[in-house]
């Protein structure tokens, strides 16, 4: 099931390789997100912020953001707080579609976590909807959420 979801996101992301577009993430841009999802580790609920650090490279469509993430992993047996710094490489294949690949570095409960993730957000003006898939301490999962540009 997870492989099918990742394949679907990849296909949607790469459909518009030849499209001309302005960057959805740019230097100085702040994006806030609220997310909920699924995971082998528990139900993830969280907020994230990404700040455009560098933009305008790779034909004007590439950008790098840095930020942070705060979340909860809820299950019948436990609740874990997560806190992480995050960094992303963004590339806009299709106008208004922000695709990104990145890393989170921080804590889940009392454990150190290094999380790789792949995501996409589609914007309707300043507001967007998104999907993100990743791994946290060998627990696969994903989130859906809403985002806003500031």
Report residues per predicted region.
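Predominantly the C-terminal beta-signal and adjacent terminal strand-loop region
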Residues: 23-30, 61, 114-150
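Cleavable N-terminal export/targeting peptides
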Residues: 1-26
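Transmembrane beta-strand segments that form the barrel wall of outer-membrane beta-barrel proteins
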Residues: 28-38, 63-74, 98-109, 126-137
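Short loop/turn motifs that connect adjacent beta-strands in outer-membrane beta-barrel proteins
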Residues: 21-28, 54-64, 77, 93-98, ...
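Residues on the lipid-exposed face of transmembrane beta-strands in outer-membrane beta-barrel proteins
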Residues: 32-36, 47-53, 70-72, 85-89, ...
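Surface-exposed, glycine- and small/polar-enriched segments that build interaction surfaces at terminal
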Residues: 56-58, 72, 81
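Residues that define the transmembrane beta-barrel architecture of outer-membrane proteins
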Residues: 28-30, 41-45, 62-64, 77-83, ...
């Amino acid at each position: 099931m997870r492989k099918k979801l990742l394949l679907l996101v990849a296909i949607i992301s790469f459909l518009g390789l030849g499209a001309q577009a302005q960057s959805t993430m740019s230097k100085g841009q702040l994006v806030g997100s609220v997310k909920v999802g699924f995971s082998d580790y528990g139900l993830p609920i969280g907020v994230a912020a990404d700040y455009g650090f560098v933009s305008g490279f790779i034909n004007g469509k590439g950008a790098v953001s840095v930020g942070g993430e705060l979340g909860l992993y809820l299950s019948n047996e436990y609740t874990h707080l997560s806190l992480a710094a995050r960094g992303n490489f963004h590339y806009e294949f299709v106008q208004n579609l922000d695709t990104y690949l990145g890393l989170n570095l921080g804590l889940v409960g009392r454990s150190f976590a290094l999380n790789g993730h792949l995501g996409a957000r589609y914007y309707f003006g300043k507001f967007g909807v998104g999907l993100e898939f990743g791994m946290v301490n060998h627990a696969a999962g994903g989130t859906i959420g809403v985002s806003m540009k500031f």
